A protein has these predicted regions:
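Structural motif corresponding to the intra-repeat A-B loop/turn of tetratricopeptide repeats
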Residues: 35, 70, 107-108, 142-145, ...
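Extracytoplasmic/periplasmic C-terminal soluble domains
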Residues: 138-211
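Alpha-helical repeat scaffolds
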Residues: 40-48, 73-86, 110-125, 146-162, ...
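Residue at a conserved register position within TPR or TPR-like alpha-solenoid repeats
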Residues: 32, 67, 101, 105, ...
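Alpha-helical transmembrane signal-anchor/signal-peptide segments
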Residues: 26-38
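Acidic, Ser/Thr-rich low-complexity segments on the non-lumenal side of membrane proteins
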Residues: 41-73
């Protein structure tokens, strides 16, 4: 057999080994996750094989997902801070982390962690996510009206609202802005719209939890 061909085959085989091991590790992880076995998950992510085959962010993110499944706010907080303080992240990873935990901190009204996440996302190129987070923070946490004109204009545009799956949540945010302005009748009007339009959508439970 040609020597170069042998080298190519060996390289191909070596290249597939981490992939095979990674798949096996992730399969074990999913089994442990189903059983809510956090200690075993932590032990698994700390193994040499996991450290070789799974990048640092992915390992820590998998552990965070386990805490999210258990709704363990204390451990979620610890793990998020651990990732932000010690794990190098690219823009996509920063956005993924923020999306995973932002609304937990909104529900808990944890302004300091919301500020940390906003600062982190501001360093990415995900401008839409930053705007969404800033809008929620200003409206729900700070009691502001910064996005009043923008939301009012968007929601008065029938074409925009008809094709926008986010409409129920935008209606909810506008209802809160009206409340922040002291306009209870308009606040109630948009709150009722939000509750009605969110039925059967991903926003239904979110709006009710923040209502």
């Amino acid at each position: 057999m040609n020597a170069m061909l042998i080298v190519a085959i060996v390289i191909a085989i070596i290249g597939t080994i981490p992939v095979i091991i990674r798949k096996k590790l992730l399969k074990n992880y999913l089994t442990l996750l189903q059983n809510n076995d956090i200690k075993a998950i932590k032990d698994l992510m700390a193994t040499k094989l996991a450290k070789i085959c799974i990048p640092p962010f992915n390992r820590e993110y998998l552990l965070l997902n386990a805490y999210l499944k258990l709704k363990d706010d204390k451990q979620i907080d610890t793990q998020v801070n651990n990732i932000m303080d010690h794990v190098p992240m690219n823009s996509k990873q920063k956005s993924a982390l923020a999306k995973s935990v932002f609304y937990i901190y909104v529900d808990n009204k944890n302004a300091s962690m919301i500020d940390r996440l906003l600062e982190m996302v501001s360093t990415t190129n995900d401008h839409a996510l930053y705007r969404q987070m800033d809008m929620v923070n200003d409206t729900l946490i700070s009691g502001g009206i910064k996005y009043y004109d923008e939301l009012k204009s968007d929601l008065e545009d029938e074409e925009y609202t008809k094709n926008n799956e986010d409409t129920p949540y935008l209606e909810f945010l506008l209802s809160v802005i009206y409340k922040n302005m002291g306009n209870e009748s308009k606040s109630k009007e948009y709150k009722n719209k939000a509750l009605e339009d969110s039925k059967g959508t991903v926003y239904e439970s979110l709006i009710k939890s923040q209502n």
